[in-house]
Regions:
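Hydrophobic faces of well-ordered beta-strands that scaffold small-molecule active sites
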Residues: 11-18, 63-65, 93-97, 120-124, ...
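Catalytic domains of carbohydrate-active enzymes, especially glycoside hydrolases
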Residues: 51-66, 163-169
């Protein structure tokens, strides 16, 4: 099973959803339904243990962390996130902590600078940012933009066409989170609509063949949890 993943020339990024200090299992974008992660009889809700177990199976260059509490304007998991970043300095972490204004990014970066932590990339989610003028978030920041798609109105890409700043794009299909399949037609349409951007995909990946299909339509990496959990349980 692991060998089939290794034959696919696409980067796999482990997705971790944090809630109250634990890794939770995503289901269809409804965050009230999230529960602490268990695989078989094993409790893998400790993010450090989860990453360690995943590294035993295959190499990770990047890990995506969504702080669900911060995204919902609750107490953040920042202290835990800082500990994770220090524990795995060889991994780049994509951090989605509900950043809404440039000052929220600057405060986060300054704290990490004081701790001498640099292995992170900021993720801006369109469900949270207050302005779609990406220039105000600064060219100097390492930024991925998460195009958070929950319904049809979230599929607009007009603001990206106008932007001179071209961050990497994460196509985040929230209703497909938890291994509920991929909307390939939507993915192809958006990628065709924005030819000058690099794309990453999240939401609904279930099988190795999904990775091949995403690679074929122009996706550079895939952010996954369900598929990785299957491998950890095998």
């Amino acid at each position: 099973m692991i060998s089939s993943l290794k034959t696919i020339n696409i980067e796999i990024i482990l997705a971790i959803d944090l809630k109250k200090g634990r890794v939770v299992k995503a289901f269809a974008g409804f965050r009230l339904n999230y529960k602490p992660l268990k695989i078989g009889n094993f409790d893998l809700s400790d993010p450090i243990i989860l990453i360690q177990k995943t590294l035993e199976k295959f190499k990770l260059n990047k890990v995506y962390i969504a702080d669900l509490d911060a995204i919902n304007n609750l107490e953040t998991n920042n202290l835990l996130i800082f500990r994770i970043l220090k524990k795995f300095p060889e991994i780049d972490f994509l951090i989605d902590s509900g950043f809404d204004y440039p000052i929220s990014i600057n405060n986060f970066k300054q704290t990490l600078k004081k701790k001498k932590i640099s292995n992170f990339i900021i993720v801006l989610g369109t469900e949270k940012i207050k302005k779609y003028n990406l220039k105000v978030f600064g060219y100097k920041n390492r930024i991925f933009l998460s195009l958070d798609i929950l319904n049809d109105k979230d599929k607009s890409t007009g603001f990206l066409k106008k932007s001179k700043f071209k961050p990497d794009i994460i196509l985040m299909f929230l209703r497909n989170v938890g291994g509920r399949g991929i909307r390939f037609n939507e993915v192809k349409r958006i990628i065709k609509d924005l030819p000058k951007f690099k794309f990453h995909y999240a939401g609904g990946v279930r099988y190795p063949r999904d990775l091949r299909l995403l690679k074929n339509v122009g996706v550079e990496s895939v952010i996954v949890s369900t598929l990785v959990h299957k491998y950890l349980g095998s």
